[in-house]
Structures are given as C-alpha cells and as structure tokens.
Swiss-Prot record:
Gene Ontology, cellular component aspect: chloroplast; small ribosomal subunit
Family: Belongs to the bacterial ribosomal protein bS16 family.
PROSITE patterns (alphabetical): RIBOSOMAL_S16 (PS00732)
Record's protein name: Small ribosomal subunit protein bS16c
One GO molecular-function entry: structural constituent of ribosome
Major subcellular site: plastid
Lineage of the species this protein comes from: Eukaryota, Viridiplantae, Streptophyta, Embryophyta, Tracheophyta
Conditions for induction: Transcribed and spliced in green leaves.
One GO term (biological process): translation
Encoding gene per record: rps16
InterPro entries reported for this sequence: Ribosomal_bS16, Ribosomal_bS16_CS, Ribosomal_bS16_dom_sf
Record-linked PANTHER family: 30S RIBOSOMAL PROTEIN S16, SMALL RIBOSOMAL SUBUNIT PROTEIN BS16M
Length: 88
C-alpha cells in the first residue's frame, strides 16, 4: 500500500519537509516512489504537484493526517471529486 507522507529534510532546528509517495513498509527517510510536494512550516510555504497527487489518490494512496490537512487547505480534494464520473 502507498501513503502520502512527510519526509524530513533541512538542518537542526530548521525542519523542511518533502511530501512523498512512499510504500507503507518503508522508513520515514527510506526510498520514496515520487516526490509530490514541499512544505516549510517556518515560512509557511507549500508547493504541491497536484496532478501527481491526484494520480496517487486515484490509485488508492492514503495520506497521513498532516498531509491530509495540507491537502485540505490547498483544496485538492475538491479537484479529486471533480475528476470522478457521476453516476445516476
């Protein structure tokens, strides 16, 4: 199973996180499948590769709680619902 998870980067007392698609069994700093975003909590900046995130979410990837909060703020889940077909 694949998760969208934060991967810590940066230096001491100055954490910066990458949002990555990674296998559940891998460690936090393990090999990721793809880098799909960036989050800097100090400067409060985010960069999201929305097409890549939507691809992994459509394939069944589960975001962690923190990543889910970041995606909600960016309104990525609204785009996910728009891409899904409607059934009558």
């Amino acid at each position: 199973m694949v998760k969208l998870r934060l991967k810590r980067c940066g230096r001491k007392q100055r954490a910066v996180y990458r949002i990555v698609a990674i296998d559940v069994r891998s460690r936090r700093e393990g090999k990721d499948l793809q880098k799909v975003g960036f989050y800097d909590p100090i400067k409060n900046q985010t960069y999201l590769n929305v097409p890549a995130i939507l691809y992994f979410l459509e394939k069944g990837a589960q975001p962690t709680e923190t990543v889910q909060d970041i995606l909600k703020k960016a309104e990525v889940f609204k785009e996910l619902r728009l891409n899904q077909p409607k059934f009558n």
